[in-house]
Amino acid sequence: MKLLKKLLAALALVPAMTLASEGGFPLDRAPDRSNDLSALQNGARLFVNYCLNCHSASLVRYNRLRDIGLSEKQIQDNLLFTSDKVGDLMKVSLSEKDAKTWFGAVPPDLSVIVRAKASSQGSGADYVYTYLRTYYKDDARATGWNN
């Protein structure tokens, strides 16, 4: 009976813990461009050229970019910098040691960030959209930005 009471008390706390884990920051609504192939291709180009230098997407293969209308030749010519094969995973050449030295922490893998950040406050896309829009210029930081 004692064990049952403890179990019920613990279960009663679950909703409160869930609400506390949500945070309280309001999310902006990301524009839905999931059917706009040119926007998706531009996003892939920006990600590979800027984000993939530090952040891996180790659960995604380059050949998945064909799903947004890119040909294998376009992928090879414009988006493959750390690999020779379109079937390879999107990994970075930055070592964990260098990342910790330069940034203070290893940049997170972004393979499933949109799924992981979905919450009752909004979709994972809303989270990423809000996150990227909150960067600002900060001359006091080594990178010049607040990230």
How would you label these PLM feature ranges?
Residues 1-34:
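Post-cleavage N-terminal segment of exported redox proteins
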Residues 56-64, 119-122, 140-141:
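Short, solvent-exposed secondary-structure capping/transition elements
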Residues 45-57, 96, 106-115, 127-130:
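C-type cytochrome heme c attachment motif
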Residues 21-45, 56-67, 75:
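Electrostatic cytochrome c docking/interface patches
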Residues 65-108, 113:
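Structured domain cores in non-transmembrane regions
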Residues 60, 116, 134:
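Short loop/turn segments at secondary-structure transitions that flank enzyme active sites
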Residues 124-147:
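Extracytoplasmic/lumenal ectodomains and periplasmic regions of secretory and membrane proteins
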Residues 33-40, 44, 100-103, 118-125:
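Solvent-exposed, acidic/flexible segments
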